[in-house]
């Protein structure tokens, strides 16, 4: 199903020409309509249009894979503007603010151009650029197509290198296979960074990357690029360019360097050093230029050099850099300001499988190679043991229970001072763990990743949980996974993996790629490609585990509320007091912000619990009036509990709507017989397409109460077959888009 958008407001109030005002009566246990019938849009149309002022849809219109994304607020952009300008003025004392703003734009321009927007980059590159770009930026390649959006649905190409983010110059070490980029903003410098992987050029004895030998993915290294703003163009990092953004300057515009050859930062601390030739070094004492991969484990980790030497790939030849390709770099700044990078060691001609590793950073471009840690492997969690802790184990026990590193005679079971024990997972994962994203929540760290490989329908987002940034992480089982992925009946979205997290305001989103064809995306052996989708996610306390787990509201192919930052409103149902006619113990699930998708989430639904099946009543009340414009009443995850319509939604109004132009008015309005979209159910095979329900949007009204009455199901067949079971109506969640009235 492909749906187009309505590009203008619905102006529903104007449709109110003549109405019958129904009196309010409270003498019945069953709610009745009162006041005027509220003109509304119900989420369905014959021409495929929908209300884009309230909802978004994962239309899969934007081609892309392995997305990385960021949301930029006014505060972010203002900080970046101020710091970029301050650095430029400090480096060039003769430069005036007026001149800098003439060339780069003033604060209002930056806010208009960059703020309140989402930015996304995807796996891609162009081998050539236009003459215009080549002339302006001295560019030879563009890497990672860059998009901009205000609603996570309409993505416009925005990269300044013919639509791409990174300006690859002739002196670059990279030459193609630009995979899996991610954004991060440095709060210290205000700059924007891209972390990703790329294939190197054909190296030689003098380069930090080896000659092209064997399969192309032997030559994958970590890439870091930097820009003053989110659109770019981004340039490959060098020590000189990065440290220039955080250094202090004297009155002559020179970096402040003390007598010990230490570079001083803006806060007076030492940020790095220079060598006797005046070269700026990174915090490891290494020179990083456009021609040196900034994250090069095969060069700077001695144990990797011993275990995976270039001679294993090309017998009889040697090179200073070992064969240890890496992809899917995920940079994360934790709550305490420490930065870590997570990635997958990629399969090579001398190593099998994709395995997850992590490393702490000394600053934005300097890995602390001594902290390199093995975190996860396909089909296994990992536990770390010191040599002393395994001293009592036999050699055969170690070989059986612990991971081996290296090849042939070079095999070892100790890496970086630890032995890594295999803990089999409940769920199979194929030979791949990739697309790693780590997010901190309280005192827990959630390592999320995708198994199997991108061509599998079950490619999804799964989670593992740890107590420290570098683990160990315990992979959770089928009772808590996937976070975002197919269930047993899903026929509408598949392959929903290699994700990223986006924090926008108070909301968390998961952006992922998905199959064009959720059932068979490789007809006749030809892979159809992937496109971009996005859904909400949040944390939910799990009593069995004793801590919060990550849960995704999706994947969806149904209308969903716009992000708060796009609508200017939020889910005010979360602030409502709720009274129900059914099971009060399950009423808490009506406004927890989570609708149910996976089979294990079925208990997280409100249950009517009326044995006589006379319907259920739900009442939301607010102590302070709220101004609302739309709602979704989410259906049950399970067909046999699902409703096919909402019989009544009645609002108690806080004031007469400004658009209401009739004299008769009695403080109420209502919507009757609000049907669920039939595209969200498969009645022949008895399953739901999750994320659907009954929805409506309308011109703004201010309310203090919302009463919902449901008394109609898709089927009563289950009750008829087995009268001993209670198949009462269930409701998964209620989302009411609105804001408090000041």
What function would you assign to each model-found segment?
Residues 1-9:
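Positively charged n-region of N-terminal signal peptides that target proteins for export
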Residues 8-20:
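Sec-dependent N-terminal signal peptides
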Residues 24-26:
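C-terminal motif of bacterial Sec signal peptides marking the signal peptidase cleavage site
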Residues 30-178, 185-328, 333-428, 440-445, ...:
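Beta-rich carbohydrate-recognition and catalytic domains
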Residues 64-66, 178-180, 326-328, 433-435, ...:
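Conserved positions at the start
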Residues 149, 223-229, 458-468, 476, ...:
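Non-cytosolic beta-sandwich-type ligand-binding/adhesion modules
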Residues 255, 263, 280, 588-600:
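Acidic, glycine-anchored loop motifs typical of Ca2+
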Residues 599-663, 690-742:
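Aromatic, loop-rich ligand-recognition surfaces of beta-strand-rich domains
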